[in-house]
């Protein structure tokens, strides 16, 4: 049981070489996220709480929004570290962030100030671990990325209290890709 509030984070899109919504890797990632979230929802998950980073965080919001018709009580929160989060992004990425923030049940900045110092990012990570009951990361310690800091914070929280940390690793993604390929092949053979 992951509890009622789940922090979802992980790799940035560029760390996985996913560039665009038609990338085949994205379908695998979203399928893996969907399967895991559905399992948690069936166990009583109420809130998905994530950030706005380009990559796993935004993909998790997209997947969660797609699950809301099946789980009408499911809520989604997008928290960002500071008020001007994403302002350095290109116009398309800023628009995507704004659109997703407009579709979730709750969105706010942890620090009610524009970016000033790295301590705001540390405060954000602390906020996420304190205000959730568990963490799900699309992350593999054998392939470090920026989510390493989130992983370390989640593991540190798990050392202090009951705070399950579940990873979707590269091996897990490979298994999902194989299952999807087998299902597609079976479908093709049956047509």
From Swiss-Prot:
Pfam families assigned: YpsA
Disulfide bond entries: none
Listed InterPro entries: YspA (IPR010697)
Highest taxon listed in the record's lineage: Bacteria
Family statement drawn from the similarity comment of this UniProt entry: Belongs to the UPF0398 family.
Protein name: UPF0398 protein LCABL_17010
């Amino acid at each position: 049981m992951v509890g009622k509030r789940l922090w979802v984070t992980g790799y940035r899109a560029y760390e996985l070489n996913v560039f665009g919504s038609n990338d085949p890797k994205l379908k695998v990632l979203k399928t893996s996220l969907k399967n895991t979230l559905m399992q948690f929802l069936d166990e009583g998950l109420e809130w998905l709480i994530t950030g706005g980073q380009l990559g796993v965080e935004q993909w998790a919001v997209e997947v969660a929004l797609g699950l809301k018709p099946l789980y009408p009580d499911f809520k989604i929160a997008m928290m960002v570290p500071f008020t001007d989060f994403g302002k350095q992004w290109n116009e398309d990425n800023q628009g995507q962030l704004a659109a997703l923030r407009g579709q979730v049940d709750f969105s706010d900045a942890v620090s009610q100030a524009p970016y000033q110092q790295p301590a705001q990012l540390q405060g954000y990570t602390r906020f996420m671990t304190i205000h959730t009951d568990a963490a799900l990361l699309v992350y593999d310690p054998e392939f470090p990325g920026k989510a390493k800091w989130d992983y370390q914070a989640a593991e540190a929280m798990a050392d202090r209290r009951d705070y399950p940390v579940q990873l979707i690793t590269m091996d897990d993604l490979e298994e999902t890709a194989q299952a999807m390929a087998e299902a597609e092949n079976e479908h093709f053979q049956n047509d």
